[in-house]
Structure formats: C-alpha cells, structure tokens
C-alpha cells in the first residue's frame, strides 16, 4: 500500500513538474565595469548581511527578552525540570511578542515598508522610518540610568528629546533594562515557591524524613497552588501590561 502511494505521488509530482514552465536562472560572476556597479554590489552585500542579522536584532529590540527570561525563572521556581519544554516556552514568548509588538510593527510597515515597496522612498529613508517605532518602544521601556550609562561610555552629550537617542545606545540600554525587569519579576515569582519549599523541608525534618528530597514533595503543592490561583492568566496578563 505504501509503495502504491509513493508511486502515485511521484507520478503526479513529475507530471506537474513537466507541465509547469520554470524560468531559467543564470548565475554568473563578472568584474564591475563602472563605479555604479560596484556600489550596487556593495548595497546588495549590506542588505544580505542585514537580513542575516535581522532575526537576532528584532528579538533584542522587542519584548521577547523579558518574556523568555521570566518564563525560564518560572520553570525553575516550580522545579519541573524540563516542563514546559524549551521549545514551548520560546514559542509562547514569540506569540506574546507578536501580540505586544503588533501596533509597533504596523506603524513601521505603514511608515517605511509600504512606501518603499511603492517606490516612494529610498531604502535609507525606509530604514530610518522603519526603525523609529521600535526605537520609541525601546526608549519608553528603558531606564534613564541605563541610557546614561552608555552615553557616558561613548562620551556623548545627553539628547534633548528621545528621537535624538542613537540606535547604538538605545539597543544595549534596552537589553539591560529588560534583563533587570525580568530578574525583578523572577525574584517575585520565586518567593512564594521558596516559602513552600521551606515549609515542606521543615515538616520533613520534624518527621525525621531527612533522606526524602523536599523538592519531590513540594512540587505537587507548587503546581496545585499555581493552578488554583490561575497562574498563567495572572503572569501573562501582568507581563503584557508591564510594557509601556
């Protein structure tokens, strides 16, 4: 039966391939014949480099950093080892990032990508207008102390308005601000579960069960309490509302 299925699938695929006229692609390398050709080649190289780095840059310029760190702290506080798995936590953080950043991304698309595709602006202007909403989001969620740190390191004057903050300063300041916020939330998450661990450990010691790991006994109580208080609803809701 499997062989018949593979045969039919292959036959249909080959028939469709023969019926479809694919355009011919010719790749060739040649030396630039004019300065304009060299500039165009360099522009293509820069664009390809940005495309490779874009996913990492977008992640550190959005709410993803705070979300994934907090979810990691939650799993450690619950003591559930690999549950939820890393892939699920990353997927949840990505989905919530899309939800939080949707207004910013829409504004970036309307101001930069759409006019660029319509050939109304150049790629340099499109880059500036496309990054502007993300930079505004980062500055709103960045502590002034962190911004001042990188201005002092680069020996730059303090800007008169948020729009004048360079992107090279806004990104690292935003990252360390997000890490600090995530660690503060992680500390608050740890406290109730730490109390449960201490209570269970004290009860086991009073009963003379010193060889029994307290984590094994406390984990079901942690999960029960987390479910009873609707922990995911509280955590995700407060995380989303924590962004300005």
Feature locations, PLM:
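N-terminal secretory/membrane targeting signals
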Residues: 1-18
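Hydrophobic alpha-helical segments and their helix-loop boundaries in membrane
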Residues: 17-244
């Amino acid at each position: 039966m499997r062989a018949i299925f593979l045969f039919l699938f292959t036959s249909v695929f080959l028939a469709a391939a023969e019926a479809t006229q694919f355009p011919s692609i010719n790749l060739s390398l040649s030396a630039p014949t004019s300065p304009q050709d060299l500039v165009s080649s360099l522009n293509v190289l820069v664009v390809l480099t940005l495309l490779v780095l874009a996913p990492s840059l977008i992640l550190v310029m959005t709410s993803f950093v705070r979300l994934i760190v907090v979810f990691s702290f939650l799993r450690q506080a619950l003591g559930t080892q690999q549950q939820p798995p890393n892939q699920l936590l990353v997927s949840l953080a990505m989905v919530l990032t899309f939800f939080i950043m949707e207004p910013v991304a829409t504004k970036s698309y309307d101001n930069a990508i759409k006019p660029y595709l319509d050939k109304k602006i150049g790629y340099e202007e499109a880059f500036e207008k496309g990054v502007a909403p993300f930079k505004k989001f980062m500055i709103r969620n960045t502590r002034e102390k962190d911004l001042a740190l990188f201005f002092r390191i680069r020996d730059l004057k303090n800007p008169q308005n948020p729009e004048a903050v360079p992107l090279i300063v806004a990104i690292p300041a935003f990252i360390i601000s997000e890490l600090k916020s995530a660690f503060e939330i992680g500390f608050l998450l740890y406290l109730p579960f730490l109390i449960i661990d201490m209570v269970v450990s004290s009860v086991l010691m009073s009963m003379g069960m010193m060889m029994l790991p307290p984590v094994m006994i406390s984990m079901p109580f942690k999960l029960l309490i987390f479910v009873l208080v609707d922990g995911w609803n509280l955590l995700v809701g407060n995380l989303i509302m924590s962004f300005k």
